[in-house]
């Protein structure tokens, strides 16, 4: 039985990946390692907690001693590394926390995997999941490709760029078998409401202001999280060693247009008069170092592995909104306590 370590598996993207692997690969033993910080929640994976091929371990990848002990207790055939601090606003407020988790934490995992696989790396794989933000900001035209030079502009993207470089360096220097992917903005269920779509869904439900940075004309490419999980599965099993794949949704939206679409759908779902939610839009001071546009060229993964998004944005957004409306208890539980303090500080 193969033993696979998935880090950050109680988070947003990680929980979808863990669920897919546990349900699809009964011959794998899945170890889910998560520190259960504010964005990690065991409720996200409650439906699989009693599966015989699943084990949860609470721990922090920043703790080198803990990681070394974990690898001494388990012989892993693969590592899917999703654990990360990922919110740009929080990185501006506390960049060192992002360095610790995203850089030092990744280093600890790389070192442990290198030592464990030193004498036999056949069939092993370290899969590092990263972001399109490492490429910086696009102009009005063009797409990020796997050959686009790195040009990070926020502490978050700088920390992820650093971790990407270390993964590749370990591949070149030590022969560590790795694959790496850079993805566009994800959306879907179990997404902590600090990112645009879940934040605004939650605010509309509660008749709170919808804070839009600057003029709202920043453009992002949106990818349904379940499509991303399928791509991760495919890259882990069929991707070529030492290769990078971009994963995108082929789905660009200006922030303000997306917000207005959300408002229209939510008014309809909640039985409110059209325009009610849109009246909540509030333009706020722009974020420092705000990248104008991200857009992914995902032709490589399509060409080499046959992946493309299967869920349209309309379908995905409908599923996402319905999930949040049907899981208000989950929303209330994750938006209590420290979340309220952070929100007040960030958007007041």
Where are these regions (language model features)?
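Residue-level signature of the cytosolic catalytic core of signaling kinases
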Residues: 41, 140, 189-193, 251, ...
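A glycine/serine/threonine-rich, flexible loop-to-helix segment
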Residues: 48, 142, 193-201, 262
């Amino acid at each position: 039985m193969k033993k696979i370590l998935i880090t950050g598996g109680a988070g947003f993207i990680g929980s979808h990946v863990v669920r897919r692997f546990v349900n699809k690969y009964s011959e794998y033993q899945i170890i889910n390692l998560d520190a259960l910080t504010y964005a990690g929640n065991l409720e996200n994976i409650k439906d699989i907690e009693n599966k015989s091929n699943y084990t949860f371990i609470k721990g922090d990848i920043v703790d080198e001693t803990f990681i070394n002990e974990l690898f001494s207790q388990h012989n892993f055939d693969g590592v899917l590394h999703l654990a990360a601090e990922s919110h740009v606003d929080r990185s501006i407020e506390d960049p060192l926390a992002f360095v610790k988790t995203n850089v030092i934490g990744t280093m600890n995992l790389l070192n442990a995997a290198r030592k464990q696989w030193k004498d036999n790396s056949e069939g092993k794989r370290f899969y590092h999941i990263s972001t399109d933000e490492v490429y910086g900001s696009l102009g009005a035209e063009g797409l990020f490709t796997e050959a686009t030079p790195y040009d990070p502009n926020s502490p978050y993207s700088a920390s992820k760029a650093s971790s990407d470089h270390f993964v590749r360096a370990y591949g070149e220097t030590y022969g560590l078998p790795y694959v790496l992917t850079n993805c566009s903005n994800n959306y879907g269920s179990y997404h902590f409401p600090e990112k645009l779509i879940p934040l605004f869904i939650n605010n509309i439900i509660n008749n709170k202001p919808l804070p839009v940075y600057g003029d709202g004309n920043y453009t992002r490419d949106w990818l349904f999280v379940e499509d991303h999980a399928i791509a991760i599965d495919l890259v882990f099993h069929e991707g070529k060693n030492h290769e990078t794949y971009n994963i995108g949704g082929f789905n660009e939206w200006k922030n303000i247009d997306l917000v207005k679409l959300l408002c229209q759908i939510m008014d309809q779902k909640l039985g409110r008069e059209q325009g009610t939610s849109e009246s909540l839009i509030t333009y706020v001071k722009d974020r420092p170092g705000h990248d104008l546009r991200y857009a992914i060229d995902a032709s490589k993964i399509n060409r080499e592995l046959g992946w493309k998004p299967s869920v349209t944005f309309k379908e995905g957004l409908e599923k996402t909104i319905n999930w949040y409306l049907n899981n208000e208890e989950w929303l209330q539980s994750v938006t209590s306590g420290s979340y309220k303090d952070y929100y007040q500080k960030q958007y007041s």
